[in-house]
Amino acid sequence: MGFGSENLDTKRFTDEMLDWVRGRGKILIVIHDNPDPDCLASAIALRHLFVMKVNREATIAFSGMISRSENLAMAKELEIPLTPIGFINFREFSVVCMLDTQPGTGNNSLPADRSVDILVDHHPMRETSKKCRWVDIREDYGVTATILYEYLVTQGVYLGTKLATALFYAIKSETQDLGREANKPDRDAYLKLFTLSNKKLLYEITHPKLPVEYFLMVNRALENTKIYGKLLITNLAQMNFPEMVAEMADFFLRLEGIELVLAMGQYGDGMLLSLRTIRHDLNAGILIGVLVEGRGNAGGHGMMAGGKIENVPASPEAIHEAEDFLANRLLTELNIIDIKPQTLQGLREKRNFDEPKREV
């Protein structure tokens, strides 16, 4: 029931969904692997809704790891109850919810033989998602947490300070302070939640201490950067923290003259990818699908996307082969030919040479 914001009455949808949940057993909330602030905030918001409206607590399950220091601080400071999915006995749960991801996308660890009952997301609709009983996918929203915030408001549920802080930080980080893919519902929620959030907790989340490995990976990304005009490609090689690819993609998009960034890094048994752009004529979700076709899975939307190609072991040769494969596909798709890649140092020297000499 329900397939998008343009046809969805939120009050009716949540009323009927809660009535359906009320007559069933234990509830499981599944979020995507290596969770980010959006899915974390969405999960505790839905959990709070169930507590307040049907008097039932849900279990939040995730896979992978939370390695980005800001996300770790968020989970700790806001006391988000999380259970590794490996400890979950799926037979115990009568209701399965999925947030900020969809069945079959490859970025969540729900077993393929387990169906999803309640699905809430803001990414493009997958055909398999239409089989779920309760579906609310709003591609015109920048953040899944905004949808969950609207559920709470529509149902008249009180938001405590920690929940408000979680939802605010999710919108803040996902949209980069409303500057990336934020629409009116996201802006409205952001402004209302700001007044309810705990500013000291926000400071603790946004200014955590960073491990030395973080700086070593940043240094590796800087050294392995290749620039093709307005395109930048960086390879973090073998990574300690899977979330670094997304962080480095955002980081390098701030470089003057750069409009598109592909960041990659080897983790586990594959190569993780993150794509970021400021170009409105490109769709990052479609573009990254081209990159991984036949070798992995990916998902995303207008300005940001992520993915993984499988079977890339942690050897220099395999990592280099994967980089060449992805770079060649991207350059071909963008019709970038006969452009010799530059390093950051080479770019600096070229720009210094091209700049007109100032008279003293």
Feature annotation, model-predicted:
Residues W20-V21, I88-R91, S109-A112, E127-S129, ...:
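Solvent-exposed alpha-helices and their adjacent loops that cap or buttress functional pockets
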Residues M1-L18, T105-D117, E139-T144, L148:
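An acidic intrinsically disordered interaction segment
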Residues I85-I88, T105-S109, V135-R138, G156-Y158, ...:
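A generic local secondary-structure boundary/capping motif
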Residues D36-D38, D100, D121, E174:
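Acidic active-site catalytic centers that drive phospho-/nucleotidyl reactions
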Residues G2-P37, A41-L72, E77, E92-F93, ...:
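Hydrophobic helix-and-loop "lid/oligomerization" segment in the mid-to-C-terminal part
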Residues H122-Y190, L326-A327:
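Short alpha-helices
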Residues L28, H32, V96, D117, ...:
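Hydrophobic "anchor" residues on beta-strands that sit immediately upstream
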Residues A73-W134:
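Active-site cofactor/cluster-binding pocket
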